């Protein structure tokens, strides 16, 4: 019992020290020049490329442990770092460096009748806590985006990716030092004990300004329930694709297969296909065949089973499941209204797509579906900050306060008002 208490006290002290160092680093970081931040990002990119072999070796340790534990193939895919992915990670850092610096950007400006000139300008949030699970690339993405937006960051990765994250973090710190920025601007929690997460959720004595969770439903639910600081919630990506009767069939087949099968383990992967009842005879069977030929397992509604009897029957839980695997639920709905009703009932409000040529259908879908990202005639796998031109994202926020959709450098800022006068006093 005493050992447990001592361990908890030790983690609390460690985390408070990390918070204090982050707070101290946030002040010079907030006023760092764009050139200095960009120099750090470029140095980080070079460090990752030159340290590729060390990162792969560290990742191999994590992969071996995951395979020994019998973790799912989709989990291992998210965990895997190879030369191609590491090169893409380094490229992502350079792309963030090329983004416009959001800090001190004038968002709006106006003059009052009394001559006061008012500006609303972007400012860093301060210290951001990022809690994530199996994706080691989040270490680089989150570190880069927080740095670019002038924020210090505390990163707490999952125990499954601890070795990979440490190797990447060492490259980030090398970049900070090379550019003359505080090495505590990007900190990685050095312990895997879950008590560290609990400590972060308290705000570490007011040092953390916002928490960003990246992971499964249980992690996000815990963060939302226990956090004493604001949260940018990144819920599961229970994404839907609706194929309207007006859809071009070849386009629909291409988009549906890509949305599901390009990478099944990411949050932008489609988990449910909805087909217009008016398209049963023309679209349903070709879509099912295309998915089956691509190696996708189908969980089918009763109506779909009548068309393709050999499929596995869907149960209610399937419509609520983010598979993150080569599995998709398929249902027939009564037109655009039925699709909207189904999405409203089961969606996580992440990303939905409509495939249609009828402008009225598209307009209704865009107006009535309440999700962060809506796509027309495009794959749900475009739900990504990099694809939006944001240079990557720290997550996809599914809430409605402050940030929604891809959380990039602009979403990691707040604002303040600068008011210029010439001696005005209030009557």
Curated annotation (Swiss-Prot):
UniProt record, GO biological process: L-proline biosynthetic process
Keywords: Amino-acid biosynthesis, Cytoplasm, NADP, Oxidoreductase, Proline biosynthesis
Pathway: Amino-acid biosynthesis; L-proline biosynthesis; L-glutamate 5-semialdehyde from L-glutamate: step 2/2
Family of this protein: Belongs to the gamma-glutamyl phosphate reductase family.
PANTHER family in the cross-refs: DELTA-1-PYRROLINE-5-CARBOXYLATE SYNTHASE (PTHR11063:SF8), GLUTAMATE SEMIALDEHYDE DEHYDROGENASE (PTHR11063)
NCBIfam families in the cross-refs: PRK00197.1, proA
Annotated function: Catalyzes the NADPH-dependent reduction of L-glutamate 5-phosphate into L-glutamate 5-semialdehyde and phosphate. The product spontaneously undergoes cyclization to form 1-pyrroline-5-carboxylate.
Protein's recorded name: Gamma-glutamyl phosphate reductase
Species of the source: Allorhizobium ampelinum (strain ATCC BAA-846 / DSM 112012 / S4) (Agrobacterium vitis (strain S4))
Organism lineage string: Bacteria, Pseudomonadati, Pseudomonadota, Alphaproteobacteria, Hyphomicrobiales
């Amino acid at each position: 019992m005493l050992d447990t208490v001592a361990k908890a006290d030790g983690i609390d002290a460690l985390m408070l020290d990390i918070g204090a160092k982050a707070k101290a680093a946030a002040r010079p970081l907030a006023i760092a020049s764009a050139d200095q931040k960009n120099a750090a990002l470029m140095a980080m990119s070079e460090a990752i490329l030159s340290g590729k072999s060390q990162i792969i070796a560290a990742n191999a340790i994590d992969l071996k442990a995951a395979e020994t534990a019998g973790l799912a193939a989709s989990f291992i895919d998210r965990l895997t770092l190879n030369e191609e992915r590491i090169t893409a990670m380094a490229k992502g850092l350079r792309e963030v460096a090329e983004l416009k610096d959001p800090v001190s950007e004038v968002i709006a400006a106006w003059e009052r009748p009394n001559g006061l000139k008012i500006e609303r300008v972007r400012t860093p949030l301060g210290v951001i806590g990022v809690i994530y699970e199996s994706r080691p690339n989040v270490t680089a993405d989150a570190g880069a985006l927080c740095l670019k937006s002038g924020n210090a960051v505390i990163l707490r990765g999952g125990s499954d990716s601890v070795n990979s994250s440490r190797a990447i973090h060492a490259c980030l710190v090398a970049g900070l030092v090379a550019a003359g920025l505080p090495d505590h601007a990007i900190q990685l929690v050095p312990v895997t004990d879950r008590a560290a997460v609990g400590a972060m959720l308290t705000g570490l004595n007011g040092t953390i300004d916002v928490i960003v969770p990246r992971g499964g439903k249980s992690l996000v639910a815990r963060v939302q329930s226990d956090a004493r600081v604001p949260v940018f919630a990144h819920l599961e990506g229970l994404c839907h694709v609706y194929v309207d009767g007006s859809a071009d069939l070849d386009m629909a087949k291409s988009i549906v297969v890509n949305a599901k099968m390009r990478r099944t383990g990411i949050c932008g992967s489609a988990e449910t296909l909805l087909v217009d009842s008016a398209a049963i005879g023309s679209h349903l069977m070709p879509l099912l065949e295309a998915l089956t030929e691509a190696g996708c397992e189908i969980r089918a509604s009763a109506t779909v089973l009548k068309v393709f009897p050999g499929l596995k029957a869907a149960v209610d839980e399937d419509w609520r499941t983010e598979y993150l695997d080569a599995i998709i639920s398929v249902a027939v709905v009564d037109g655009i209204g039925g699709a909207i009703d189904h999405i409203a009932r089961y969606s996580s409000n992440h990303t939905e797509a409509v495939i249609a040529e009828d402008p009225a259908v598209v307009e209704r879908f865009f107006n009535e579906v309440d999700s962060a990202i809506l796509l027309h005639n495009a794959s749900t796998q475009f739900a990504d900050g990099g694809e939006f031109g944001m240079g990557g994202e720290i997550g996809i926020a599914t809430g409605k306060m402050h940030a929604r959709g891809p959380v990039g450098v602009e979403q990691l800022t707040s604002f303040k008002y600068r008011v210029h006068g010439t001696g005005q006093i209030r009557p």
